[in-house]
Amino acid sequence: MTGRDGLSDARSRSRALAPGCPPTGSRLRSFAINDLLGLEADLPTPAEPGLRSNSGDPAEAIGSGPGPGPGLCGSCPARGALPLGLGLLCGFGAQPPSAAAAARARCLLLADLRLLPSAGPEPAVAQGPVHPPPALGSQQRSESVSTSDGDSPSEEKNDPKMSLILGKRKKRRHRTVFTAHQLEELEKAFGEAHYPDVYAREMLAAKTELPEDRIQVWFQNRRAKWRKREKRWGGSSVMAEYGLYGAMVRHCIPLPDSVLNSADSLQGSCAPWLLGMHKKSTGMRKPESEDKLAGLWEFDHLKKGANKDEDGPERGPDETTQNPENSLEDVAIDLSSSSRQETKKMPPGSSTQLPQPPQVGAS
């Protein structure tokens, strides 16, 4: 049962108790909301003594009746223009009027006027703008703040920059799986040089069919593994030489004298692998350099001999007679390869029987 039903029941009881009110069993004239709720009152007759008193204040009408019946019953016809709670005042008709009853009726009337709106024209106070209580306003502000905070993650997700950053974080490169042949070639190259140059990396890439950047990363990881193992074994001096060697390879710095001086005693050196790599590199470079130097020396001497052959007829007779040793050297240089072989086959004592070059100036 709601509050309106309770008020309607109380109103019906008050009508039954009041002598001037219409009976409760009367039939409703229409199905309007006022008739269903009992808000519409019967029209007053001029014979009723409380008609004039209803024109004034309802509270005055309640206390102005001569007796309990007419004074209180006069308020029943005025219920159509007053709020719903005024029907309860009819229950006081059986009691004699007193100051306490009048004050109580006035309080009930004022409470009904404040809480329940009337069916007639609204008062001027209700026509003004209705402001919500501060508690509701603060609650609405807190809800708006919470909704804005709750929408912020969705805005960040919708932001293209944030989505790109999340995509970059989630993107991971797959690990490269090396075959046995590739690992064998890489380990062999690592045994030769821990810091391969660009040419060595390109050769490894051609052999193993791996990209050069993957080879470089493999060497970085392999050096880190080697350093970890050397630290575990306590090779601090080896680590120092290793770091120095890496700096030298990067900046093309020659080996220090301490390492070069310990090349004779390989077993007592602090970095035997470094000396081994140094000897291997020098051993690979030395034959090539010697062959190049020998070829250049022969080419230069042959060129000088050809120039001397061209300048031979112009020289005077005194040059060969004054310097016989120089003349023999010139002749030996100017001879062809066949004449050289013949001179090698001749005994050492017959070197003085070499043919003399013709003296052009003597004739």
From Swiss-Prot:
The keyword DNA-binding applies. Residues 1-25, 42-66, 122-166, 300-363 are annotated as: Disordered. A motif (Octapeptide motif) lies at residues 31-38. Disruption phenotype: At embryonic day 14.5 ocular morphology is normal as is expression and localization of retinal transcription and cell cycle regulatory proteins. It is found in: Nucleus. One of its GO terms (molecular function) is sequence-specific double-stranded DNA binding. Residues 171-230 bind DNA. A motif (Nuclear localization signal) lies at residues 168-173. One of its GO terms (biological process) is neuron maturation. GO terms for cellular component: nucleus. Residues 231-283 form the CVC domain. Residues 137-151 have a biased composition (Polar residues). Residues 1-12, 300-318 have a biased composition (Basic and acidic residues). It holds the Pfam family Homeodomain. Keywords: Developmental protein, DNA-binding, Homeobox, Nucleus, Sensory transduction, Transcription, Transcription regulation, Vision. Expressed in the postnatal retina (at protein level). In the adult, expressed exclusively in the cells of the neural retina with expression restricted to postnatal cone bipolar interneurons. Belongs to the paired homeobox family. Binds to the 37-bp core of the locus control region (LCR) of the red/green visual pigment gene cluster. May regulate the activity of the LCR and the cone opsin genes at earlier stages of development. Dispensable in early retinal development. This is Visual system homeobox 1. The gene is Vsx1.
